[in-house]
Structures are given as structure tokens and as C-alpha cells.
């Protein structure tokens, strides 16, 4: 009597088809993980920037270095040993203002006042006001590896007389 070894051609084709269906079902989920990670990172950064904005406004009010909403000259406060440029009671729109509000961010040597230059910060890049990289030319951060970096960003819109607005853009992540 002859012993059969292995699989028949029909069994092999059935297994390959089943594996193909499973792969086609699971692949979109794995591809979307990068987008989800970028979206979560931008949303987390937006929350951090909003918290820093409120903290700095409270600190400037308490320390007497400027009352939010009151027009004053540029001044400085120190948070965790890092000097921060303040205007009108809020972080200014340059990398040595709102940029240094994020732990671990280091402003370039010589400062960056009136500079829209890109400053890398972890997975993000910070751009000062007038940069053309963040919608409206506002200051902010973006993820350069996103499909549309300008729409995977955190905007810091500084309106000279009121509370700056933090906008999180995730449509391009």
C-alpha cells in the first residue's frame, strides 16, 4: 500500500487563499498605525502647549512680570532654569518664547528672536512666527514625516491683546 505524504494541490491553494484574505483584512490596520501615532503625538503636544501657556500666564501675573492682556515690553521669566521670552504676559512667538515651554527643547545659541528658522525638537520641528510652514505663518510645531506636515501641526496664534490660541491640526497626519 502506498503512503500519502504532504498536501494535495487543492489543500495548498485553499490555505494560500485563506492567508491572502487574512492579510488583506489586517494590512490596512497595520498601515494606519503610523497615522494614529502621529495624530496622538500632535494632540499630546497641543495639550502640553496649552498647559504651558496657562502656567506662564499665571506665573507672570503672580511674579509681576506682566499682567496677561496688558501691553508691556518684552520681559523674561525663568522656568526650570530656562529663560523664556514673554510679551504681554504670555510666551512670545519665537523659539525662546513658546518654543522653550516644552521640556527638553533648547533654543539655539545666540537666541532666535525674529527668526522663523526650523528648530528640531524630538519628532517635531518648531517654526517661529512668519515661517510659511505652519498655516497662517503662525509659530508652531509640525511632524515633518507626516503626509501633509503643515496639517499635522500645533499652531500658536499670538494676538497681541488677548490670550494666544493653540490650534491642533491633525487632518494631514
Predicted features and spans:
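Arginine residue identity/basic-tract feature
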Residues: 2-5, 29, 38, 85, ...
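Short, contiguous, well-ordered secondary-structure segments
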Residues: 15-17, 49, 55, 164
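N-terminal single-pass transmembrane signal-anchor helix
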Residues: 1-34, 41
Amino acid at each position: 500500500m502506498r503512503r500519502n505524504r504532504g498536501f494535495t494541490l487543492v489543500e495548498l491553494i485553499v490555505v494560500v487563499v485563506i492567508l491572502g484574505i487574512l492579510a488583506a483584512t489586517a494590512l490596512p490596520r497595520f498601515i494606519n498605525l503610523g497615522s494614529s501615532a502621529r495624530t496622538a503625538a500632535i494632540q499630546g503636544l497641543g495639550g502640553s502647549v496649552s498647559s504651558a501657556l496657562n502656567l506662564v500666564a499665571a506665573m507672570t501675573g503672580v511674579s509681576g512680570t506682566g499682567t496677561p492682556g496688558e501691553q508691556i515690553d518684552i520681559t523674561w521669566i525663568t522656568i526650570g532654569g530656562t529663560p523664556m521670552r514673554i510679551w504681554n504676559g504670555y510666551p512670545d512667538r519665537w523659539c525662546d518664547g513658546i518654543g522653550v515651554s516644552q521640556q527638553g527643547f533648547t533654543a539655539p545659541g545666540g537666541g532666535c528672536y525674529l527668526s522663523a528658522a526650523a528648530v528640531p525638537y524630538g519628532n517635531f520641528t518648531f517654526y517661529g512666527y512668519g515661517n510659511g510652514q505652519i498655516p497662517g505663518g503662525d509659530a508652531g510645531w509640525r511632524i515633518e514625516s507626516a503626509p501633509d506636515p503643515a496639517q499635522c501641526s500645533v499652531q500658536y496664534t499670538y494676538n497681541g491683546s488677548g490670550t494666544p490660541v493653540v490650534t491642533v491640526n491633525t487632518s494631514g497626519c
